Amino acid sequence: MVYPIGKRIIPPIVKFWIKQANGLQNVPKKGAFIVAANHASYMDHFIIMSTLVPYLDRKIHHLAKKEHFDNIFKKIWHTWVGAVPIDRESGGKEALMWAIKALNQGEIIAIHPEGTRTLTGKLQKGKVGVAILALTAKVPVVPIGLIGAFEILPKGKYIPKMRKATMNIGKPMAFGKYYGKKINKRMLREVTTRIMKEIARLSKQKYNFK
C-alpha cells in the first residue's frame, strides 16, 4: 500500500528540487541492473527514485543502513523505495545476498558505492559491494552522477534548501570479461574503480582513489 501511494505523491514534490535529468534513454527498460550513484545528500534517494520509478514504472530496491528504519517517517519512505536494511557492523553480507537474489530474479537494485554520505561534497573511496553484486549476478551497472544535491541537504542538516540538482545518467557498464573467472580482491577493486571513475565524470568531479 505504501508503494503505490508514495509513487503518486512523492515525485511531484521532489520535482521542485530537480533542475534536469540527462541520459534517461540510457536506462534499460527491461531486465535486471544496478543503479550506482554518488552519495552527497539524503536528497539523493528522493531525486533518483522520483525520476527513475515514474520513467520505468518499475520498483527499484535500495540498499540502506538499518538506522534509516528507526522511526515511522523514515520507515515509510524507505519502504516506498523498496529499501533493504544493511547492518554495516556485520559487513552487510545478508543484504548483499538478498540483493543478488533479487537481481537474479530480474529486479533493479540501487546502491551508493561510497557507503555513506560525504561530509565535504566530494567523492569518497568506493566500497566493493557494487562490484560483488555486478560480478556475482552478472548484470550491468548504470552509473549516475548527482550535481547540486549536497547544496540542497548536506549531512547533518534536516531542512532542504530550495536549490536544484542535476542528475546525469551514463550508459550501462558491462563487465562480461570477468564472468566465469574466480572473483578476487584485485578484480573487485578494479571494477569498483571503473564504476567510481564514471560516476566522477558524470558528477564533474575527480576520483583520486585506487
Predicted regions and their residues:
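A generic structural signal for well-ordered alpha-helical segments
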Residues: 14, 55, 77-78, 102, ...
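Helix-to-loop junction immediately C-terminal to a conserved catalytic motif
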Residues: 8-39
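A secondary-structure boundary/capping signal
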Residues: 23, 38, 64-65, 82, ...
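Non-catalytic C-terminal accessory region of glycerolipid acyltransferases
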Residues: 94-210
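Catalytic core of membrane glycerolipid acyltransferases/transacylases, capturing the structured
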Residues: 29-90
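Short, flexible loop segments at the rims of nucleotide/cofactor-binding pockets, characterized by
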Residues: 10-15, 85-89, 120-121
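Short hydrophobic helices that act as membrane-entry/anchoring signals
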Residues: 3-18, 75, 79-82
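Glycine-rich, highly charged phosphate/nucleotide-binding loops
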Residues: 16-20, 90-96
